[in-house]
Amino acid sequence: MVDWVEAMKTKLTPPWGTSDSQSHGISRRTALKLAMGMAGVTAAGAATPAVAAAPGKDPRRAATKRYKMKKSINLWAFPYPDRMNLRECLQLAKDAGFEGIELNYDLESDLSPKSKTKEFTAIRKMADKIGIAISGLCSFLFWPYPLTSNDPKERARGMELAGLMTQAAHDLGTDNLLVVPGAVHMPWREDHDPTPNDICDKRARAAIGKLLPKAEKLNVHLNIENIFFNGYLMTPQEMIDFVDSFDSAHVQVHFDTGNIMLFQFPEHWIRQLGKRIRNVHLKEFTKKGTDHSLESFRPLLDGTTNWPAVIDAFETTGYDGYLTFEYFHPYPHYPEALIHQTSDSLDRMLGRLA
């Protein structure tokens, strides 16, 4: 068995989740706790209503232009399931002023292979009753079960899980499924046998091609995420070539601002990807004193991302969908503070403060 505790301490850790608890002996939440360095931070203020007055004129307070994009947050920012249940997380997101929440498919949670259409439909109805949209479905399971693995059993399990996620997304009432199409390497997995670039590309294209018919039938978009740390689809043009090769409206891009910040710039990618961007992860990143681990990702606005340029780039492409904050360190004390703080930050970024 791989010593994942030591691996998380010394290796580059994935900025989108951790390994499968059953196959590697450590839960997602436990692994993420190893990277937690943030103590409770007080909220920046009460959430601003989703529909606000015209933006103010002081650029020190907030954007002076109103943007159409919608506010969303990923479930990983909540202390779920340790200290809050799913209903409480949805309600907190709604109360904080978010219009949507992105859920995560796991092996041991309310959203797992153990749940079927009945259970997922109940979650959708619960979200509807609370008044919050499910902006998308995400999963860390593409790492223990990569679609391009040299191990046929891992590939087969990955395809099986991706198919289940597609059905789950449909049942949850969202048409957005984040997909990691493959990996040349995974620095955080010492047991991963690197896949040659050409073979990785061939397998990734074959995998998405096999998943596509079901996705089209269920009207679920397979949104390909830019990872960078996996050594695959490293430039905007590579992503464009990959997505366009399927000639399907159901293969789009899930763009992550933070994953490329170490060496590149999200505002450059956005303008090139254009209308292909279907969904977005806002991950704040800092280049100051980073150890290239999960600690590189910070609370929103506490990093080195040029957010005015990024938001302007999204507007230039016509994007008006969800901006989902993704963060892996629920505050150990008063976790609601992070949620309200993030909502306030997004209000300022989107010009929702008068």
Residues of each region from the PLM?
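N-terminal secretory signal peptides
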Residues: 1-26
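N-terminal twin-arginine translocation
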Residues: 25-30, 41-59
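Active-site acidic/histidine proton-transfer and metal-coordination neighborhood
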Residues: 34-46, 60-66, 85-90, 124-133, ...
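Acidic/histidine-rich catalytic cores of soluble enzymes
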Residues: 68-70, 100-101, 137, 205-304, ...
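Conserved, mostly hydrophobic/aromatic
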Residues: 73, 93, 101, 127, ...
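Active-site beta-loop-alpha junctions enriched in small/polar residues
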Residues: 76-78, 104-106, 139-142, 182, ...
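Catalytic domains of carbohydrate-active enzymes, especially glycoside hydrolases
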Residues: 88-106
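Glycine-rich, proline-tolerant flexible connector loops at the mouths of alpha/beta enzymes
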Residues: 104-124, 181-184
